[in-house]
Amino acid sequence: MEEAASQSLEEDFEGQATHTGPKGVINDWRKFKLESEDGDSIPPSKKEILRQMSSPQSRDDKDSKERMSRKMSIQEYELIHQDKEDEGCLRKYRRQCMQDMHQKLSFGPRYGFVYELETGEQFLETIEKEQKVTTIVVNIYEDGVRGCDALNSSLECLAAEYPMVKFCKIRASNTGAGDRFSSDVLPTLLVYKGGELISNFISVAEQFAEDFFAADVESFLNEYGLLPEREIHDLGQTNTEDEDIE
């Protein structure tokens, strides 16, 4: 009997939350609460109430719908306002919603490291053939030039933090236009999107202190709006993180 009821509940709530309106969000919350509760920790009567509240009803059943609405008002209030019990469930629900939203926004290719471009042809191919939604950051450098090694190290760190951005580096002598990139303009940082150059910074190391790090480069790029929102690696493991969500 319990197995059949469980199967019925699963059929009622099959699929992911897709409601976007206020009523849809409330139904998603009720659904999440019911699914996240242990079967033995919630009375059958309350489980049935939650199931009925989260299940869509036919438009033709107006009388039944109105009766259910009146009947649910007090019972629903009790369920949703069980402070300590519902607080944890609500946090889980919010984290799940953020995770779902994050996954939907995190479409497209992912990289996670700095690509070494060996030739000018490879450089052009990277710019022209990459997806239009992808931001490409290229460091033109030479060994032994001040700031080049520090910038490459910083980009390695940023590539891990922003895997949706393609970070690349190429020696000036390998670009096929080495005469245009003398040591006094290096390192040069070029930013492309959709095959177009959207920002370029020559002698970019001059923007930083003598010793600079990934955080400095990150702040600099963010000033120009060149980086997307940072990746969320772990959604709410601590109470502090949960409170930040609220």
From Swiss-Prot:
The modification Phosphoserine is found at residue 73. Residues 58-69 have a biased composition (Basic and acidic residues). Inhibits the transcriptional activation activity of the cone-rod homeobox CRX. May participate in the regulation of visual phototransduction or in the integration of photoreceptor metabolism. One of its GO terms (biological process) is visual perception. Residues 1-14 have a biased composition (Acidic residues). This is Phosducin. Keywords: Cell projection, Cilium, Cytoplasm, Nucleus, Phosphoprotein, Sensory transduction, Vision. Residues 111-246 are annotated as: Thioredoxin fold. It comes from Rattus norvegicus (Rat). Light-induced changes in cyclic nucleotide levels modulate the phosphorylation of this protein by cAMP kinase. It is found in: Cytoplasm, Cytosol; Nucleus; Cell projection, Cilium, Photoreceptor outer segment; Photoreceptor inner segment. Interacts with CRX. Forms a complex with the beta and gamma subunits of the GTP-binding protein, transducin. It comes from the Eukaryota. SUPFAM superfamilies: Thioredoxin-like (SSF52833). InterPro entries: Phosducin, Phosducin-like_reg, Phosducin_N_dom_sf, Phosducin_thioredoxin-like_dom, Thioredoxin-like_sf. Belongs to the phosducin family. Gene3D superfamilies: Glutaredoxin (3.40.30.10), Phosducin, domain 2 (1.10.168.10). Residues 1-246 form the Phosducin domain.
